[in-house]
Amino acid sequence: MKNIILEIEEKIYSDEDITFNEAITLFQSSYDKNLNNLLDAANRIRNKFNGNIVDLCSIMNAKSGRCSEDCKFCAQSEHYNTNIKKYNMINMSDALNLAKENKEHGINRFSLVTSGKALTSNDFEKALEIYKEINKRVNINLCASLGILSYNQLLQLKNVGVTMYHHNLETSREYYNKICTTHSYDERIETINNAKKAGLMVCSGGIIGMGETITDRIKLAFELKSLQIQSIPINILNPVKGTPLEYTKRLEQNDILKTIAIFRFINPKASIRLAGGRNLIDNFGKGCFRAGANATISGNYLTTSGNKINDDIEMIKSLGLSLDI
């Protein structure tokens, strides 16, 4: 098995793509000693194409709850009784202060994230004003995650300083309807393509541990590759009480590590970003940075707590890695 891993690794260094069947073979055969061989190879691929730099980003839940969509994993959906805090669009000062604070702590990217399929025109204008002010007053890269937007809206975001748009595919096309029925996979892809057309970089990934198969995960990784996604966040399902996935069995550690490694093999030049659910991984995902990951969301998530920024920075430095500042 080690020879197969090395052969595929060499293919990637020669700018050849791993095939779907090769990815399946790597995942299914990587146990015990072979697991370490797989993780080591993914780490070398990460180093070859991305160096030892780790990108830290942070997010702000800028509008919480009351979402019309039925995503089975989500605490913010109106379809489920999850007892989360609900509020309308945050104000300028709160967003500006958090962006400043995160920059001072060493964060490279900052994003507003809003609930709902799309923002109202009024809320979208508020978001534009907030981004315009942050861009003027804080030296930090700006990202946005505001749902399904048109090309013109995405162009407006770019014009006020946003450089990257986040919009997850969540899972494979085949499994998607088991997770969401209120909007389509193609609507998500259209938003991604509109963002690229507007000149924005794109951050798009998914959630693992929702009952999908290994094949679904690998199909997602190849879909992201076909879309030339620059930043791929991998979330681990943190089952929320009141949602349909409340009683879903949590993934084993090795399953998470293998998934990250395979995503690195399939997308060697992308940023593989640890996202929600890091608290379910040993040491807040420390081992993932030896399995191909080279980016992470630091601080709190949307409705759950994350790792402290200073703790993340210490962890990254302890691994001999550097921060992208």
UniProtKB/Swiss-Prot annotation:
One of its GO terms (biological process) is biotin biosynthetic process. The gene is bioB. Belongs to the radical SAM superfamily. Biotin synthase family. Residues 49-278 form the Radical SAM core domain. It catalyses: (4R,5S)-dethiobiotin + (sulfur carrier)-SH + 2 reduced [2Fe-2S]-[ferredoxin] + 2 S-adenosyl-L-methionine = (sulfur carrier)-H + biotin + 2 5'-deoxyadenosine + 2 L-methionine + 2 oxidized [2Fe-2S]-[ferredoxin]. Binds 1 [4Fe-4S] cluster. The cluster is coordinated with 3 cysteines and an exchangeable S-adenosyl-L-methionine. Binds 1 [2Fe-2S] cluster. The cluster is coordinated with 3 cysteines and 1 arginine. Homodimer. Keywords: 2Fe-2S, 4Fe-4S, Biotin biosynthesis, Iron, Iron-sulfur, Metal-binding, S-adenosyl-L-methionine, Transferase. Its EC number is 2.8.1.6. GO terms for molecular function: 2 iron, 2 sulfur cluster binding; 4 iron, 4 sulfur cluster binding; biotin synthase activity; iron ion binding. Its cofactor is [4Fe-4S] cluster; [2Fe-2S] cluster. This is Biotin synthase. HAMAP family: BioB (MF_01694). Catalyzes the conversion of dethiobiotin (DTB) to biotin by the insertion of a sulfur atom into dethiobiotin via a radical-based mechanism. [2Fe-2S] cluster binds at residues 111, 143, 203, 273. Pathway: Cofactor biosynthesis; biotin biosynthesis; biotin from 7,8-diaminononanoate: step 2/2. [4Fe-4S] cluster binds at residues 67, 71, 74. It is an enzyme of class 2 (transferase). InterPro entries: Aldolase_TIM, BATS_dom, Biotin_synth/BioAB, Biotin_synthase, Elp3/MiaA/NifB-like_rSAM, rSAM. It comes from Clostridium tetani (strain Massachusetts / E88).
